[in-house]
Amino acid sequence: MRKSTKQFTFGAVLLCLLAGGGYFGYQQVFTKGLDRLSKKVCDDAVARETVIRALPDSRSAEQAAKQNGSGTSYTFSCRIATSGDSILSGEAKIQDTSERTWVDFYGSHAGTALLRSSADGVEALAQLDNHHGTASVYVPCIPRGVQASAASESYALVTEARAIGDTRSTGTPLRQVVTDFAYQIAKHAYTSGECRTPRSFPKELPRYKAH
């Protein structure tokens, strides 16, 4: 009887170890795709942790960045896609637009109120709608080799970002992380797009208030 009890105990322990190992293996293979990205993605523009805050666990994930043009034709884009069809993407462009025109554009398309945040001349907003989070960041920028007087309104670096598919959060927290993603792209693009005026960016923008 004693031998049978020992065998049962050993079998139970072995089963637990196998189950634990199987769960660990499952996690490593099917849920750690984002963790295997570089510490910074998209030409070192965006922190991996920001992507992890936005997108759910996945088996694999890929990132891509693209820069084109210069002056008023400058663009920079960043895209992260997972095997679960979740996407976090954003683009920065030099645009001839005032801050007021920028706000009005997003306000007219949101259908509801906008979340707003600003610091040191950098403006950010996010749309409060029922679909995927869309956010934008506005930074005044006169590109090298471009005359400010050539603008009909004013030159700015405008970044737009959004999350598509399943996300790790919803509501205001989702808008916050998409805004953080857009802000990191904007900081990178301000330098690579050769904006003339030196600028010190805060580490992060003030947090949105929960809605």
Regions from the PLM with identified roles:
Residues 2-27:
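Hydrophobic membrane-insertion alpha-helices, especially the h-region
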Residues 30-181, 186-187, 191, 198-210:
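A small/polar (G/S/T-enriched), proline-flanked helix-loop surface module common
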